[in-house]
């Protein structure tokens, strides 16, 4: 069962390939309101002058926790997992980041080190920006300054959600329900009727590490959610039919 489940997630990661990065950010079909890259056309043009584009295969390391943060990265396509912990010990998945996410912003602004490690779950395209070039870009554009503040606030909200999921949810079902809702909000899409849909990118083992339980318990709990009609998992996609039910578990 575990091998089949891992194979299914691997297929999903291969299926959800990131789109090719467009010639210009303004032409990118992935952009959404509220993302850092959803800036005015003139500001975007200046951003492109200080960035390049890189591609990562699946399961490739982008940066490691504790490294000097010399660059930040805008995700144009694909998905990465962020982990924290001691390198010689167990790693905890902090969250999954997708298109529109900015990685390493706080570390770059504070002239510090990366607080997490980043590894691609799928092939991904990114725009790296060197620290000094990004700081110079911010000094020239107040719109970008405000967007950077908004991104920092979003990172704080993600960290608070992570802490609440582990510390405040008393049952595994409540913690897993919170995790599904977080994934839906971070990498999913809204559906008519109030539901959400997002790609299944994590194995049950990985989800278990995020909710402090075992893989078997995650499998059993997801099965109960499906039996109750709260979620469905089909064609490598998770659909939350009744997110309010998951929320009520907390």
Regions from the PLM with identified roles:
Residues 35, 44, 60-123:
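Cyclic nucleotide-binding regulatory domains
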Residues 2-58, 102, 107-109:
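Cyclic nucleotide-binding regulatory module and flanking cytosolic helices
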Residues 83, 105-106, 136-137, 179, ...:
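Residues that scaffold the ATP/ADP-binding catalytic core of kinase and kinase-like folds
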Residues 41, 77, 99-102, 123, ...:
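ATP/adenylate-binding site constellation spanning eukaryotic-like Ser/Thr protein kinases
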Residues 139, 143-210:
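Polybasic "coupling" helices that flank or enter modular domains
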Residues 53, 96, 128, 201, ...:
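Short aromatic/basic micro-patch
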Residues 43-44, 95-161:
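Cyclic-nucleotide recognition modules
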Residues 183-250:
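Phosphate-/nucleic-acid-contacting segments
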């Amino acid at each position: 069962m575990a091998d089949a489940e891992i194979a299914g997630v691997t297929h999903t990661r291969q299926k959800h390939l990131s789109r090719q990065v467009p010639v210009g950010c303004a032409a990118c079909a992935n952009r959404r309101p509220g993302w850092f890259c959803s800036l005015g056309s003139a500001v975007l043009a200046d951003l492109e002058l200080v960035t390049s584009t890189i591609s990562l295969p699946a399961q490739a390391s982008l940066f490691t926790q504790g490294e000097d943060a010399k660059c930040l990265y805008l995700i144009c396509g694909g998905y990465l997992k962020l982990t924290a912990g001691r390198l010689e010990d167990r790693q905890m998945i902090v969250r999954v980041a997708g298109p529109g996410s900015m990685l390493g912003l706080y570390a770059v602004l504070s002239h510090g080190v990366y607080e997490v490690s980043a590894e691609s779950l799928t092939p991904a395209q990114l725009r790296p920006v060197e620290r000094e070039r990004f700081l110079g870009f911010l000094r020239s554009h107040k719109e970008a300054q405000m967007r950077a503040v908004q991104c920092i606030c979003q990172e704080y909200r993600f960290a608070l959600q992570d802490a609440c999921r582990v510390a405040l949810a008393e049952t595994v079902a409540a913690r897993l329900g919170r995790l599904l809702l977080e994934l839906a909000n971070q990498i999913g899409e809204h559906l008519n009727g109030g539901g959400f849909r997002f790609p299944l990118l994590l194995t049950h083992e990985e989800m278990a590490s995020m909710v402090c339980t075992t893989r078997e318990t995650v499998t059993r709990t997801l099965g109960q959610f499906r039996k109750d009609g709260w979620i469905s998992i089909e064609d490598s996609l998770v659909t939350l039919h009744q997110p309010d039910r998951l929320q009520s578990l907390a």
